[in-house]
Structures are given as structure tokens and as C-alpha cells.
Amino acid sequence: MSDTEQELQRVIRRHYREKRELQAHIQTLKASVPKNDKGRRKQMLADISRLEAEMEQRHKQELEKFGENPDSSVDSVTADLEKMNLENMPPRPPKAQKRRDRRAHQERRHQERMPAAQAEQLAANRREEEEKVAAILGAKNLEMKTIPADGHCMYRAIQDQLVFSVTIESLRYRTAYYMRKHIDDFLPFFTEPEAGNFYTREDFLRYCDDIVHNASWGGQLELRALSHVLQTPIEVVQANSPTIVIGEEYTRKPVTLVYLHYACDFGEHYNSVKPIEVAGAFGGMAPRLF
């Protein structure tokens, strides 16, 4: 096999992995927005459509750089990859799920023609949320610090405030490990987003695998696990709800996260915080809060 063919196969394998990661991210997005919040669901579906189109276009451009039609190679490598991952793939979706997917696709197409008034309302909600959060944080002499919206935002916001060096991969692994070791403390809180059925132990273990291997978004249950892992309280500031404190049994200075509903195009998002910089003070990075 030539070097060009080997490189092509590496690219195709990466594309396959990226597609699976995007699908996992999409499922998390769908579960994160309440069904009765039509405005946010429409925005979320439009974001999903854009993400899919951007990935498809990028993959196409990368394959075209090889100077030939790679369709046959793509089919061959993809078939091999699917065979390798067959045992780890979830079961095929039932007919009801397929109908929901079709409706979601139709809604995405409708969302592409969202009236300007709705876009203006979303922007207004975003500004209002940011102003309220700024007031809450200002009372603590803090201000919001933007974290990338890449599916790792919760873990990145925590990483940003720790005095010791730790990778996102390590935080995800330690979160999943703790949840597996204390499955009875977490399992009762997990239900299927659509049907509402409680997770089986197998469902829960697959969920923990996603924490480690995918850019799955985290929530309060993952924060509970992280507070135990770090032995540190974690407080979550929101614009329209009281601040939530997780891990109050620990005495260290808390890590503070900001939970946003409108600041990110993908749906809910976590940001970090930092001390407010005083004008005229000596430069340098603000101290971390751990």
C-alpha cells in the first residue's frame, strides 16, 4: 500500500470517528432542551443542521485533496470499521425513533427559515441572561470567563480553576470511574430522554463509557461525582435560579461555574469565572480559585 493510500485510510478513519462523536453530541443536545421550550428547540435543531453540513463539507474537501474519487476506498474502510465496532454499537432505532428523527429533520428545515423576530428575541434573552449573571458574580468580586463550547465545557471550566495540572481526559475518566464505583448512588436518577424509562445497569455503564470516550456534555450528576473526586464544593451560578452548591460537606474554597441557557448556539453551556481585575493593578494572570 502506498503512502498516499495509507494517509487516505487514516483520514477516512478519522472521519468515521468524528461522525460518531457528532452523533453522540447531537443526542446530548436533544436531551438537554425541554420539549416544551419550542424556541430553544428550534434553535438547537438549526445548530445541529449546521454542524452536520459543516462536517460533511469539511470531510468532502479533505478527501478531494487526494486528487481522485475516493468513494470506493471510503466504502471499503467504512465497512471494515463498522465490522470492528459492531459489538459496541447500540441497537438499531425502533420505528418510533425513526419517525421522531423524520419530524426532527422537518423541524430543522423549518428552523432554517426562522423569522428575524425570533432571532432578535434570542439575542435579547442572551443579553438579559449575561446582565443578571454579571450582577450575581459582581457581588462576589468575580466576572465570567468564556470557555469554548466543544462538549467539554463543564470539564474545561473546572480545569480552569484548579491549581494543579490535570487534563480533560483525566477529569472525564475520574468522573466515570467514580460513578461506576458508586452505581447505586447514581443509577436511580437516570432515565431515557424520550420514553422516560429508568436506565438499566447496562445503559448506565454505556453512559459512563460515553463520558470517557466522547465529548458528551455533563450535568449535575457528573458535578456530584467530580466534587467527590476533587473533595471540593462546586457552586453553579444561574441567571434565574438560586445558586446550587454541590459537595457542601467539603471545606475547600468552592469552584464556581456559570450555567447559561442562551449564551451558546448549541443549548446549555458552562463558563468559568475569574476575579475582577482592578484597573491600575499590576498585570499578570488572575489567581486560580481552588
From Swiss-Prot:
InterPro entries: OTU_dom (IPR003323), OTU_OTUD6 (IPR049772), Papain-like_cys_pep_sf (IPR038765), Peptidase_C85-like (IPR050704). Residues 147-153 are annotated as: Cys-loop. Residues 142-276 form the OTU domain. Residues 211-221 are annotated as: Variable-loop. Its EC number is 3.4.19.12. Residues 27-117 are annotated as: Disordered. GO terms for biological process: protein K11-linked deubiquitination; protein K27-linked deubiquitination; protein K29-linked deubiquitination; protein K33-linked deubiquitination; proteolysis. Keywords: Hydrolase, Protease, Thiol protease, Ubl conjugation pathway. GO terms for molecular function: cysteine-type deubiquitinase activity. It is an enzyme of class 3 (hydrolase). Residues 95-108 have a biased composition (Basic residues). The active site is at D150, C153, H269. Residues 49-68 have a biased composition (Basic and acidic residues). It catalyses: Thiol-dependent hydrolysis of ester, thioester, amide, peptide and isopeptide bonds formed by the C-terminal Gly of ubiquitin (a 76-residue protein attached to proteins as an intracellular targeting signal). Residues 259-269 are annotated as: His-loop. Pfam families: OTU. Deubiquitinating enzyme that hydrolyzes 'Lys-27'-, 'Lys-29'- and 'Lys-33'-linked polyubiquitin chains. Also able to hydrolyze 'Lys-11'-linked ubiquitin chains. PANTHER family: OTU DOMAIN CONTAINING PROTEIN, OTU DOMAIN-CONTAINING PROTEIN 6A. This is OTU domain-containing protein 6A. The lineage of its organism: Eukaryota, Metazoa, Chordata, Craniata, Vertebrata.
